């Protein structure tokens, strides 16, 4: 998310001598790394009601396709998804299976840029948080034959021995997500919900 990148930049300017290392992994892997005390902090996506960390944000989850292509009409439906263990992937597959709609996983990536590359090129459909849809990508809904999706909760988790610096970064993340949600609600009329 742009807001996450902005938050990291804000923190880096405030603490130029602190080196932050970022891992982009499925939530299941992040939980394992936290349990092994190999991460100080993790942002984990889950369904509201299943949160175990500090909820930073809740937002609508949408099916997404390129504005200028018709991948969403293909049979079987081509999908660009995150790796196994990601809730967005699970929600997409469960939704399509529930409809009995044929699909194929055409692209798999651990990063949002990899998923969006396939979608913006018109090669696949994906499931994402509404706030991360870039220009040229639009949401799909029931009128186009796509099932509803659960909202996403973005939660902050801490490792076993978190330093004062990591707690400070957690504070920056909290503030960054709050500012992003406010900005999103003011510009789109589709607010993300702060916890």
Give residue spans per PLM region:
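Secondary-structure junction motif
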Residues: 78-99, 163-166
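Ligand-binding cleft/hinge of the Venus flytrap
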Residues: 7-15, 89-102
């Amino acid at each position: 998310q742009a807001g996450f990148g902005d938050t990291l930049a804000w923190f880096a300017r405030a603490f130029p001598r602190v080196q932050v290392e970022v891992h982009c992994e499925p939530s299941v892997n992040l939980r394992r790394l936290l349990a092994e005390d190999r991460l100080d902090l993790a942002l984990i996506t889950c369904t509201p009601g299943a949160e175990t960390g500090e909820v930073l944000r809740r937002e609508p989850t949408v099916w997404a396709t390129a504005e200028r292509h018709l991948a969403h009409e293909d049979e079987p439906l081509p999908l660009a998804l995150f790796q196994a263990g990601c809730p967005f992937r699970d929600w997409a597959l469960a939704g399509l299976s529930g409809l009995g709609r044929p699909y194929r996983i055409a692209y798999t990536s651990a990063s949002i840029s990899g998923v969006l590359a396939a979608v913006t090129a018109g090669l696949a459909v994906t499931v994402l948080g509404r706030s991360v849809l870039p220009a040229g990508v639009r949401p799909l809904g029931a009128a186009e034959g796509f099932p509803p999706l659960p909202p996403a909760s973005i939660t902050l988790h801490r490792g076993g021995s978190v330093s004062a610096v990591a707690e400070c970064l957690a504070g920056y993340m909290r503030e960054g997500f709050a500012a992003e949600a406010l900005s999103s609600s003011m510009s789109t009329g589709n607010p993300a919900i702060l916890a």
